[in-house]
């Protein structure tokens, strides 16, 4: 029914908070298999929900929600066992999947049919060579404003976050000896 009113944002966020709180209380602290969410992953997502609910788009902030987000995030940072990787670019290399920085890690199924591979990568990949033949729109590009947020000369973080034309990536298409992104979709 197109006349059905939308759910209120605050009601949806309250439901998400209840679901994630239940997950934090009932999931194991250590995942039972790769790609499975554990209590720490749920707690990290819960912190993000409280941060979102704190009023970032309304011009004012709900300090109670900000404090809750801070408390949850600090618990994850200090007690979950995750740690930052020394080299940011390594996060995107296949051999570093499910690394100590991964709070929640989706698993890639190479050359699977649509819906079973990493569909986010397939949606965003510059072309199908990067994904082994599966990609969709591939027209997403970083905006000039976004690229200008990186310091001049910072090619490591920028090139690891976005494929930039002319950049060689040794860890993409490894069987073919790497991949140079030409900007073509």
Feature annotation, model-predicted:
Residues 2-14, 26:
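Aromatic/His-enriched, Gly/Pro-containing loop or helix-boundary segments
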Residues 13, 20-22, 36-183:
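An aromatic- and glycine-enriched ligand-binding surface/loop that stacks and positions planar moieties
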Residues 26-36:
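Flexible helix-coil transition and linker loops at the boundaries of alpha-helical arrays
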């Amino acid at each position: 029914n197109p006349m059905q009113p939308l759910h209120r944002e605050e009601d949806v966020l309250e439901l998400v908070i209840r679901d994630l709180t239940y997950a934090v209380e009932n999931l194991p602290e250590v995942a039972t298999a790769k790609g499975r969410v554990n209590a720490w992953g749920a707690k990290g997502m819960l912190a993000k929900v409280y941060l979102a609910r704190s009023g970032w788009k309304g011009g004012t902030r709900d300090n109670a929600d900000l404090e809750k987000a801070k408390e949850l995030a600090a618990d994850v940072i200090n007690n979950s066992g995750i740690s930052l990787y020394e080299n940011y670019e390594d996060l995107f290399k296949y051999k570093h999947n499910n690394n100590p920085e991964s709070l929640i890690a989706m698993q890639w199924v190479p050359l699977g049919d649509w819906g079973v591979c990493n569909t986010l990568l397939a949606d965003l990949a510059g072309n199908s060579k990067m994904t082994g033949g599966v990609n969709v729109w591939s027209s997403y590009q970083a905006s000039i404003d976004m690229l200008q947020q990186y310091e001049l000369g910072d090619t490591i973080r920028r090139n690891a976050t976005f494929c930039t034309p002319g950049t060689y990536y040794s860890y993409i298409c490894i069987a073919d000896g790497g991949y140079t992104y030409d900007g073509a979709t």
